[in-house]
Curated annotation (Swiss-Prot):
Residues 1-22 are annotated as: Disordered. SUPFAM superfamilies: Homeodomain-like, Tetracyclin repressor-like, C-terminal domain. Keywords: Cytoplasm, DNA-binding, Repressor, Transcription, Transcription regulation. The gene is pnbX. Transcriptional repressor that negatively regulates expression of the pnbBA operon, involved in the degradation of 4-nitrobenzoate, and its own expression. In the absence of 4-nitrobenzoate, binds specifically to the promoter region of the pnb locus, inhibiting its expression. 4-nitrobenzoate prevents the binding of PnbX to the pnb locus, leading to its expression. Other potential ligand molecules, including 3-nitrobenzoate, 2-nitrobenzoate, benzoate, protocatechuate, chloramphenicol and 4-hydroxylaminobenzoate, have no preventive effects on PnbX binding to the DNA. One of its GO terms (molecular function) is transcription cis-regulatory region binding. This is HTH-type transcriptional repressor PnbX. Its main location: cytoplasm. One of its GO terms (cellular component) is cytoplasm.
Amino acid sequence: MTRTARAKSAPAVGPGRPRDTDLDTAIIHATRQRLAEQGYSQISLSEIAAAAGTTRPSLYRRWPTKLDLVVAALEWGFRAQTDSYPTEAISELEPREAFIEAIRRLDPAYFNADAMLLMGNFMGEARRTPELLDVVRERAVNPRLAQLEAVLLKLREDGRIRADTDVRTVATLCFGAYFATFLREDADHRAIAERVCDTLWPSMVADG
């Protein structure tokens, strides 16, 4: 069993009164806000409970540990980002537009403007609480990279990009562009996908 599998992303369910889903949502939102402001090590479950209008015992009945709660908050964000994608499938787009859209979905801040701060915090916690980075890799980073790689593989198979295109390296470069932009304090991260495509596409496109 992996560390991620041991981290519970779903609230505990037990006998008694029906669950208050509005309270669950309030707790998740309070957790996400404090993660961005304070980081994993510094967040207080008492403060989260107070911000959500509940108590620590009520919080613990839902998520037995801080890690369980934070994983649940991350899972909520991953689902929300996926739900926010355009309804048109990438496979229905023209080759260049499909490449751009897949790059766009790599953006950690696609849905959550504070995502880069969270990523930095989780990387800083890699030795103390490696489960956090495991969750991010398995539920967010790897699936999004796999989607871009699948787009590139299809384009390569169809002869739209060069047969010697290193799909994995291209995907890694695209993902890394978001971190470099954040660290350089470039203002418009929303334009990254187009700029990266403008740079890489001419060297990838198949002759003829």
